[in-house]
Amino acid sequence: MQTGHPADGVYLGLMSGTSMDGVDGITVRFETGKPPAVLSEAFVGFADTLRDSLFALQQPGDDEIEREALAANALAARYAACCHEMLRAAGLSPDDVRALGVHGQTVRHRPERGYTRQINNAALLAELTRIDVIADFRSRDVAAGGQGAPLVPAFHATMFGSPDETRVVCNLGGISNITILPAARDGRDERNDAVRGHDCGPANALIDAWALRHLKRPFDEGGRFAARGTVDETLLAALLDEPYFRQSAPKSTGRDLFNADWLDAKLAGFRGLAPEDVQATLTALTAASVADEIARHAHDCRAVYVCGGGARNPVLLDALATALAARGLDAPVATTAALGVPPQQVESLAFAWLAYRFNARAPGNVSAVTGAAGERVLGALYPR
C-alpha cells in the first residue's frame, strides 16, 4: 500500500452473494502500514419476496427492466438498513465514514459477451445513508477484456500471504473460487504477478437449491442433509463432465450456468436416487472441483483457508480435505479464522478495501487472475 495516503480512514463494505439470503456488512478503519481494524459488522436478511424477485431476474422473462429497477430499490433499502445498524454498533455517524463499497447483486455474468450485471440503486443508497458510495467494481475489468471475477485475490494477497509457504484461499459462496498465494519471500504485495485465482464451479448454489427443494429450507445446515446420504460416483462423474471444469484459467462462472435447470438435466438419468444421496454428491462435486483446481495450479500448496457460507458446513470442509488428500496434496483445511479474519467477514471486508483502493486511485484487480489488459482502478463514485 502507499505510504501516508489521504485515503486512510473509515470505510463500509457490503456484499450480497449468490446465495441471495441477505447482505453482510462491515465497518473497518484502513491506515497505511497497519492491518485493517474492524469496528462493527452486521447481517440483514432479505424477505422472501425480494429473494424471489432476484432469482427471477436470473432467468429470461417479460418486463425484466421494471422488475430489475424495483429489485434494485429494494436492495438499496436493505443495504442502507445494514449500514445504519453497523454505524450504531460502532458509535459512528455518516460523516465519520470515507466511503461505502458495495458489490450489488449479480443477476447476469457473461464476460465473454462483454458485460456483467450487479443490480443496486447506488444513487438511492447514497441518499439513504448520506455516505459516498462506490459501486460497479466489476465492469471496468470486463471492459479491459477481463473476466470481472474473482476480484478478491488482491485483497487476499494483502491479508493472507505468507513468506514461507504457498497458501490457497478458497471462497465457498454460491460459486467456489480460489486464490493461490505463492510464498512471498519479499513481503506481501497485492500486485505480485505470481498471485493467481479463478472460479472453480458450483458450491452453495446447488447445495442450497437442493435443500430448498427437499427440506423447504434455504440451506443444508451443518451439512446434515448431505451427511445422511452416500455419494453416487456415477452421478458425480456425470456432474464433473461439464466443459467448464476443463476450461483453462482465467475463467469465471455463475448461476447463468450452474443452476437448478443444469442440475435437473444432469439428473435425468438418475431418477431413482434418494434426495440425501444427491445432496451428498453435490457436496462431493464442490469438493472435487475445488481440489482438482488446486492440484492443477497449486501442487505445492501447504494450507487451504476457507471463507464464505461453506465455511460453516463441516461436511463440506471434510469432503474438501479428503479430496485434497486423494490428489496427493498435504494441505490441511481450516477457515480464515485461523488467520485472524472470521470467514463471514472476508468478502464484505474485501469490498470495503476496494473502496479504499478507489479513493487512493490504486488498482483493485489482478490482471493475471482476471485476464484483463492490465491493472485498473475499479468502481464508480456516487457522492453523498
Curated annotation (Swiss-Prot):
The keyword ATP-binding applies. It holds the Pfam family AnmK. Signal peptide: none annotated. Its EC number is 2.7.1.170. One of its GO terms (molecular function) is kinase activity. ATP binds at G17, T18, S19, M20, D21, G22, V23, D24. Pathway: Amino-sugar metabolism; 1,6-anhydro-N-acetylmuramate degradation; Cell wall biogenesis; peptidoglycan recycling. Belongs to the anhydro-N-acetylmuramic acid kinase family. Catalyzes the specific phosphorylation of 1,6-anhydro-N-acetylmuramic acid (anhMurNAc) with the simultaneous cleavage of the 1,6-anhydro ring, generating MurNAc-6-P. Is required for the utilization of anhMurNAc either imported from the medium or derived from its own cell wall murein, and thus plays a role in cell wall recycling. This is Anhydro-N-acetylmuramic acid kinase.
